[in-house]
């Protein structure tokens, strides 16, 4: 359910959790960023997939989160995506070409279908050995599962 449609108590708790997370991780977070949710959440997601294909496993996605939650930038804007590429010394035109091609569209669609098949209901979610781990506060459980 989109954040604005959640029960007011749930919305209030979400803001409290964001404060806790920011403090625990020492991250600057704008709890109500101007551009959340992004106008087009699919575009930055496709750029993340493209950057992964180019060998940037986490940096592009991490920068997108920083730009959205800390810098209050619209990550569905090509100019902002280009700014992120420049910061990471990535070729924007190359990533853009990859992000907008049919292969990435198919992979993005497959990721969505896989999420539905695995009963993913929110982000962040991780599926390992057919078991779902939901929420940043469950990463320790995922870590334990990975060690087995």
Give each language-model segment a name.
Residues 1-68:
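Structural alpha/beta surface segment adjacent to cysteine/selenocysteine redox centers
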